[in-house]
A protein has these predicted regions:
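Alpha-helical transmembrane segments
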Residues: 1-29, 33-34, 59-87, 163-352
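Membrane interface segments of multi-pass transport proteins and intramembrane proteases
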Residues: 30, 34-35, 93-98, 124-134, ...
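Juxtamembrane helix-capping/reentrant segments at transmembrane boundaries
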Residues: 38-50, 210
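Transmembrane alpha-helix boundary signature
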Residues: 63-73, 91-97, 114-129
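Membrane-embedded alpha-helical core segments of multi-pass
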Residues: 83-88, 105-117, 142-155, 168-174, ...
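Membrane-interfacial loop-to-helix junctions in multi-pass transporters
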Residues: 133-143, 188
Length: 352
């Protein structure tokens, strides 16, 4: 099929409806099997909230993509890899997997796509530099790293009601818009489906949340956004397709990088939870949970718009705007105390 507006509307509504209808059922299921979120050091939540909501997002996305795109070679790879990752997420939401096991699951899920379905960043056409080709021994690890980076970035911001789902929605719209403009209807349809699924879920996940997406959801979102952008980059090799998701998620990516630097400096494990992420610092600065989420949405929308301007209009101007904004952003993040020393909170194991 082509990319008629009717087709996109159907893709969007199918994902939205399936996720919206299934979320209450997933919620009951999560409660029954004990996949509930207990408040801990990183959480700002009180009381038990069911996890696993990502299952409903996954279902909405899959049903919509299968109905509209079908099983094209690359999309099949993305769906298989995402399904592997969803199983890792479910296990993690039920029993809390060790960080190393989770990382291994992420690597394998990415490898399925990159190795068996050849979805990788094998060449890129950079403005002013021309075409750069990567040999397999670079493109395969590079693409796996790219996917894992997005998985963990979205995973990291899933700390406040509606935060990850809303940010993923905005980023998905930006990627869909670019793909649509470049005539890549499969990438566009996939991101439109993701937008619908996230919005269907947000109805239940916005503050005060009745359900969390859990790692099932956040890892799935990161995976699909990363994988679809790689799939798109293979068609055109324009750097644009990779720049948009990077810049759209500039805030959480910067937050992730700062978190890793902060933890290395403090000598604690990279994946250990702490409360120094930007959203925690904004809460500490006196904003309500809802206000913090809206500030993060606004930042994401701003960066997404900037990214689209960059790649459609003037690369130099856009890059300047983005670097300037990032500079201001990092300055404020430091001022808010994002880089403070990490003091590890007592873990659940210590309390038992």
């Amino acid at each position: 099929g082509g990319g008629s507006l009717f087709a996109y509307a159907f893709t969007f509504l199918a994902a939205l409806a399936v996720t919206f209808i299934l979320t209450p059922a997933v919620k009951n299921f999560a409660v029954q099997i004990g996949a509930v979120d207990k408040p801990d050091a990183r959480k700002v939540h009180h009381g038990l909230v069911p996890r696993l909501g990502g299952l409903a997002i996954y279902a909405g996305f899959m049903v919509s993509v299968i109905l509209t795109v079908g099983f094209t070679y690359e999309m099949t790879g993305i769906m298989i890899g995402a399904t592997c990752l969803v199983f890792v997420g479910i296990a993690d939401d039920i029993v809390s997997l060790p960080a190393k096991v989770k990382l291994l699951g992420q690597i394998l899920s990415a490898a399925v796509l990159v190795i068996f379905f050849d979805v990788n960043i094998d060449w890129i056409d950079l403005p002013y530099m021309g075409i750069i080709e990567f040999p397999l021994f670079i493109s395969v690890p590079l693409t796996i790293f790219w996917i894992i980076g997005f998985i963990n970035t979205v995973n990291l911001i899933d700390g406040l009601d509606g935060l990850a789902a809303g940010i993923a929605t905005i980023a998905s719209i930006a990627i869909a818009f670019l793909a649509f403009q470049m005539g890549q209807w499969i990438s566009a349809a996939a991101m439109v489906a993701m937008t619908g699924a996230c919005l269907g879920f947000l109805q239940y996940n916005f503050n005060p949340a009745k359900i969390f997406m859990g790692d099932t959801g956040s890892m799935f979102l990161g995976y699909v956004i990363a994988a679809v952008s790689v799939m798109g980059s293979m068609k055109t090799a324009a750097a644009a397709v990779l720049i948009v998701p990077l810049v759209a998620l500039a805030v959480p990516i910067t937050d992730t990088v700062l978190a890793i630097v902060r933890r290395r400096q403090s000598g604690v494990p990279i994946f250990s939870p702490d409360k120094n992420h930007l959203h925690h610092r904004l809460l500490a600065a006196g904003l309500s949970q809802k206000q913090v989420v809206l500030v993060m949405y606004a930042l994401t929308a701003f960066f997404s718009a900037a990214a689209l301007l960059v790649v459609r209009l003037n690369p130099f101007l856009g890059v300047a705007v983005i670097l300037l904004t990032l500079g201001v952003f990092i300055f404020w993040a430091k001022k808010l105390g994002v880089m403070r020393e990490v003091v590890l909170p007592p873990t659940e194991k210590d309390e038992k």
